[in-house]
Amino acid sequence: MHLIRPFTGLRPATGRAAEVIAPPYDVLSTDEARTRAEGKPWSFLHISKPEIDLPAGTDPYAAQVYAKAAENLGLMMREGILTRDPARCYYVYRLIMGGHTQTGLVAAASLAEYEANRIRKHEHTQTDKENDRVRQIDALNAQTGPVMVAYPDAREVDDILDRCSAGAPDADATADGGVRHSLWVVRDAEIQARLTRAFDAMPALYIADGHHRSAAASRVAAARRAANPRHTGEENYNYFLVVIFPHHQMQILDYNRVVSGLNGMDVGTFLARVRENFTAEKSPKPVKPAKPAEFGLYLAGQWYRLAIRRELIPASDPVARLDVKLLSDHLLGPVLGINDLRRDKRIDYVGGIRGMTELERRVNSGEMTAAFALYPTRMEDLMAVAEAGNVMPTKSTWFEPKLADGLVSHVLD
């Protein structure tokens, strides 16, 4: 069994990509999705967020929602908006956001290798979110949300992808926000074989974004395997939809924190506690950390540059030395009493795409008391955590640009 293989992708008909592609299902609320899809009958949001086509207030996890997704997918196929390639292909997918470009391979990845941890994870998943994706995949009989994966340095693969994307793309669309999504179909059997061999030679791949989608695909495969007396391992359900990028091209933005209250302390007392483990210097302008172990703090209209004391940074533990963990272990927990980062209502998270002004706005509005700006987690840190078999703290990574839903889907029959 190969690590990856080509597949017969379901994708927008020629010239229809701009009408179809949509942000990932989990970055928009129902109301946001309804607004985005207004006047766009072929937006993939009608499949990924199908509750927008049902009465307001419909439970997004009701059976009728998944049925509506299947109905909408069937309609788009019957109307020729989505068409399926007749033969197995790989696809080269390029994302351009501002001055950033990354080029990856769309493929079907082996769930057996995922379950054997050759496709490595770095996050825990939540059962309710997994359940939602399982029901979506089963209802559609397809995986429509690609998992973002990284491969370690492989010049041969980089060169093949560059050559395959040298001509005009088969699909090209600029989405809301200005991100350009381009797709090239790789039909040549010899090039496909070279790509398959190159990935077979890799010791591991690393999931960057999409842990719930991959876990759900694994669960669907297990159920179908158990129900299929003629199971061979070659069925499409034994693979999951991925886009694999070279790790050095992937862009992780800062994932910042805002907190409500100072755990009963006034500003002076709080800063004194902070200075037990950090240096803290006032700054006349916003502090966007320029290196690891440096943090920005915005409090009472004032920015501070924080630096954790070097002796507190573990030399070898790949999780404990992460900036998100250092902040939690030496400030959020012991000073503010925020120990459950997933459930504590006093903390919220702000993706770096929103900028420093959003941190100031959340505090200046009185909604939050303090904001912490962090240096982005590096891909090398993520890979080290995955190699050690550990998991990242919650809200450690914010990848940009995001993959589009609807550009290529993986049908399970």
Identify what each model region corresponds to.
Residues 1-413:
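Surface-exposed, charge/polar-rich loops and edge strands
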